[in-house]
Amino acid sequence: MTFSVDKVRADFPVLSREVNGLPLAYLDSAASAQKPSQVIDAEAEFYRHGYAAVHRGIHTLSAQATEKMENVRKRASLFINARSAEELVFVRGTTEGINLVANSWGNSNVRAGDNIIISQMEHHANIVPWQMLCARVGAELRVIPLNPDGTLQLETLPTLFDEKTRLLAITHVSNVLGTENPLAEMITLAHQHGAKVLVDGAQAVMHHPVDVQALDCDFYVFSGHKLYGPTGIGILYVKEALLQEMPPWEGGGSMIATVSLSEGTTWTKAPWRFEAGTPNTGGIIGLGAALEYVSALGLNNIAEYEQNLMHYALSQLESVPDLTLYGPQNRLGVIAFNLGKHHAYDVGSFLDNYGIAVRTGHHCAMPLMAYYNVPAMCRASLAMYNTHEEVDRLVTGLQRIHRLLG
């Protein structure tokens, strides 16, 4: 199948609107991607004609809704090549998935004197839950440092592992720098030391195929809203043997086998014991439509188009005076930058006046900002619906801002 960015853009209604009298150039998909009509329509159709509570009724609507929900679990398992759909837990997003692991697996397996390894490039969602866990149990948090080019100092990694290392929690792709970490060698090293590995895949799954069996990671988590799906839904993958041993971290309906006031409560099997309460069924249906949409386009086709666009953007940005780029030359999805000594918020505001949407701030990565000694950065993210013309508009906008502000 030949990838056509024009055909893709036609599927996204918001891309036809104007901002400040100019065509919208949406360069903020790493924060949250826009939604194609196929996703919007699938969720709307479910609420119009198919809605019912799942797992709780024998009537037709409930049975059909349950089947649709479980079919999305199967589709998601194929999307990341899990061995079984029962290795996937529906969560609100990457943040909840990581917190689930920290509070369930972490509370059961990390003790005083143990250690957990993260990196200096992590999103706060892959830092704070581990800080909280370490504070609860008296464990140590160790950090893989950054290089100036935005890669990790991997030569330090073997020195961080010891017999007390319980987990390596690492991002697949940095949400600020676009760095893709060499997961295969990192996971192999962790397993050699008896540690488990959690991968934050929030910035990876939309850019190229992910195979959790080939990676051999123990946990993999991602959000739907960055993958052209709805907000409030994501996927946590856990190897089946681990998942079946993990205790629930939230109690309520759907996650129980029996409840007795005199004899206590027993849990249902995983993954359902981690899905207490009424799920975001509409979001799940929308996620299924997003997975179907992306799969039909072909992730390899998307990857090829996006990489060509990224190479073009990096080359064109060289023409902008006083522009500082952060991150390696080979990157996925994002370009973080600052213009001279101007604050990122000011630059982002000017770009918005030109109809260009970029993200500004610390990007939930304050330790990374501290490493580069800046309070904030601008971040332009490139998705499958972005164009060379939009890159040109970004470059022209930055050149214009430089002329105006000096």
Swiss-Prot record:
GO terms for cellular component: cytoplasm. The modification N6-(pyridoxal phosphate)lysine is found at K226. SUPFAM superfamilies: PLP-dependent transferases. It is found in: Cytoplasm. Its main location: cytoplasm. The keyword Transmembrane helix does not apply. The keyword Transferase applies. InterPro entries: Aminotrans_V_dom (IPR000192), Aminotrans_V_PyrdxlP_BS (IPR020578), Cys_dSase_SufS (IPR010970), PyrdxlP-dep_Trfase (IPR015424), PyrdxlP-dep_Trfase_major (IPR015421), PyrdxlP-dep_Trfase_small (IPR015422). One of its GO terms (molecular function) is pyridoxal phosphate binding. Its cofactor is pyridoxal 5'-phosphate. Its EC number is 2.8.1.7, 4.4.1.16. It catalyses: (sulfur carrier)-H + L-cysteine = (sulfur carrier)-SH + L-alanine; L-selenocysteine + AH2 = hydrogenselenide + L-alanine + A + H(+). CDD domains: SufS_like. Keywords: Cytoplasm, Lyase, Pyridoxal phosphate, Transferase. GO terms for biological process: cysteine metabolic process. Pathway: Cofactor biosynthesis; iron-sulfur cluster biosynthesis. The active site is at C364 (cysteine persulfide intermediate). Cysteine desulfurases mobilize the sulfur from L-cysteine to yield L-alanine, an essential step in sulfur metabolism for biosynthesis of a variety of sulfur-containing biomolecules. Component of the suf operon, which is activated and required under specific conditions such as oxidative stress and iron limitation. Acts as a potent selenocysteine lyase in vitro, that mobilizes selenium from L-selenocysteine. Selenocysteine lyase activity is however unsure in vivo. PANTHER family: CYSTEINE DESULFURASE. Homodimer. Interacts with SufE and the SufBCD complex composed of SufB, SufC and SufD. The interaction with SufE is required to mediate the direct transfer of the sulfur atom from the S-sulfanylcysteine. Belongs to the class-V pyridoxal-phosphate-dependent aminotransferase family. Csd subfamily. This is Cysteine desulfurase. It comes from Escherichia coli O1:K1 / APEC.
